[in-house]
Amino acid sequence: MKMKSILTLLLTSLLAASGLHAAKKNTPVWTSLDAANIPVSVKIQGEYLGQINGGGKIGAQVIALGGDNYQAVMLPGGLPGAGWDGKNKILLDGSKKDGGLLFHSTNGKGKGYLQEDPARFSATRKNPPNGNKAYSGVISEGALQGKTDDGKSFELRRVIRTSPTLGMKPPKDAKVLFDGTSKAAFQGGRLDEKTKLLNTDGRDIRTVDKLSNYQMHVEFMLPYRPDARGQGRGNSGFYQVDMYEVQILDSF
């Protein structure tokens, strides 16, 4: 009988920005939330969840586009994997005006999928997307408040969803490939003594042991690169048995 091994990889990698829709070389990038100059938009980008007054649940994903520009994707029913109907989206363009962060509906005219110019950016390939409506809103103090096309009010609060396995301890007899103290289990790579992260420096690294039957636990971080688009915002991954890639991207 072939024995099944349990492989736990506690890998916290800073992911390189590359691939399609690559960012310009001078696009600013942050790799720590503690950076002194990280823009306030990092606290605005994210997922929001709430209720339409007299209606159902609604979610939103707010995308920072650089500077004071944003786009909100409103999702009827809730967030992806947690209530969204999987079909309909409502796009709102956002920018700072008179000290507030205001959002208004877009009809899709002049828009293009993942365009670099925030005024032309669309998070959806189809413009306008299915279910698009004339919503409006404002973000303040972690809340997205606004009105639907028929005048109903809504309020969404910023939420941070986490995996139930985040921070999971390795099972008994698991092989820990990386825990922030040593890179001995890898051929190549660099251990950053300050951050305790395993860095690939843009090169492939491989495990010393050749493994083929396992369960993998991976933890990772993404850079913050709001001026970039598509995979340029953060793109990396790892290969299982040197063949099947698990790609890790900025989910927005």
Tell me what each language-model feature is:
Residues 1-9:
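Bacterial N-terminal signal peptides that target proteins for export
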Residues 48, 70-72, 103:
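A short hydrophobic beta-strand element
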Residues 22-25, 79-252:
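Carbohydrate-interacting regions of secretory-pathway proteins
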Residues 8-17:
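Bacterial N-terminal signal peptides
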Residues 45, 57-59, 69, 211-217, ...:
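A common structural microfeature
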Residues 52-96:
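N-terminal glycine/threonine-rich, aromatic-flanked beta-hairpin/loop signature
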Residues 49-51, 73, 217-221:
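Residue-level recognition of well-ordered beta-strand positions that form the cores
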Residues 25-68, 185-196:
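Short, solvent-exposed loop/hinge segments that bridge or flank secondary-structure elements
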